[in-house]
Amino acid sequence: MSLRQYFVERDPFTSRAFFPVFSKEDLTGPEGVERLVAVRNTEEIMGVALNTAFPDVEARYKAFMGRLTRPEKRLNVVGLGDVGGTLVTALKLLGDDIREIGIYDPNESLCRRYEMELNQVLDREKPVIRILDEAELFDCDAFLFTASRGVPPLGAAGDVRMLQFEKNRDMLKTYTKKAREACFSGLFCQISDPVDQLSRCVFLQSNRDENGTYDFAGLLPEQVAGFGLGVMKARAAYMARRMGVNPSTLRAYGPHGAGLVIANSPTEYDSDLSDELTRLTASANREVRALGFKPYIAPAISSAALSILALLRGEDFHGAIPMGGVYFGCVSKMTPAGTVVRAEALHPELETRIQKAWAELKEGEASCRT
């Protein structure tokens, strides 16, 4: 598909590298959460806007789209802990259009176990599971990062996701450097917590040269996506059913944790009901922890496996995407010209809540630059 190209120059810290153009107004349109209410006809793409603030943006855009449009993709997964192991299992069962899943973990026995067991699943020849060497990590179409340091023990107080931030941010530096050195042109899927903040770290870390100067020659903002919102939507639906509320009109926005926004409806918004749904959804993981288990099955399947496959297939997915200098959770889909968010009319109170959640992420963005 050949698209007309429009060249723009925007601040690379807060803007997209490429995006679909449906009308000339898009060339000067907003970058933040205002996009969620910018309702317009998105049936026919007029072209693609390329941001020249990113070096060689045209070639990098084409390389990325070349990866995403391959009929059978190769995925590499780093980290075979609770989430990673469940994710690989789900991808094996659901990924008919995935050719190969590469797996990597410092624990070689874990790698051997998953390679043996998942390649012995009856009548599931694809995807093939293969153990990776470290040098092969970024030889793929999508890189899935689930590794985590310092997962809080059962009974830990506070937002257990944010307790992992500094250790996981520092661990990521090794991998973002490798992605930069490999000139990685695929999709970097950030799965370990806190998803939204770490997605921003991935983008920023990869775009520093050896002197620490930002040159924006690493990953494009669209090459990074965070996967934590899917399970929040699923948990909200579960809680709604328990309350006798129809889950079909539910909406989920924002981060996977503090700042999450669950709405009972985009237009028939009930603030009290939505606040209660948000509270129950945000604390759902603690219900599982109270039973003596770590809550990793639903996140690995809903936030990671199903959402990543939906993105790769060009379907609507729940995930954190670049939005005005942060990675913000919403429903969007990947097109040949870039990401299109689900824009719709929103109740004014809901719009205010979303703006507040975005502003809180923006306030904490400085910690992503360390």
Report the location of each language-model feature:
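Glycine/serine-rich phosphate-binding loop and adjoining beta1-alpha1 elements at the start
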Residues: 1-74, 104
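Rossmann-fold NAD(P)-binding glycine/threonine-rich loop
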Residues: 2-14, 153-217
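Long, compositionally biased stretches enriched for glycine and/or charged residues
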Residues: 8-30, 240-370
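Conserved beta-strand elements of the Class I
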Residues: 76-78, 189
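Hydrophobic/small residue at the entry helix of a nucleotide-binding pocket
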Residues: 83-86
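Conserved S-adenosyl-L-methionine
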Residues: 93-100
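Conserved N-terminal Rossmann-fold NAD(P) cofactor-binding segment
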Residues: 100, 104-140, 149-152
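Rossmann-like dinucleotide-binding core of oxidoreductases
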Residues: 192-267
